[in-house]
């Protein structure tokens, strides 16, 4: 997963403004006790970070992949 995909999923699930608050403040045990922002800077896999955020925020697994995006023509 690219970092841009991580942010797209965060924005879709939590809204653009609240996703930044979560990334800055929510401590994720699964990525070394870092916040999502810290974990991204430290080089953790964005997909791993996304899954940790989903677990901590009780996002249903059915929404972990986000919504379908149509390919550009």
Residue ranges and their predicted role:
Residues 1-73:
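C-terminal alpha-helical interaction appendages
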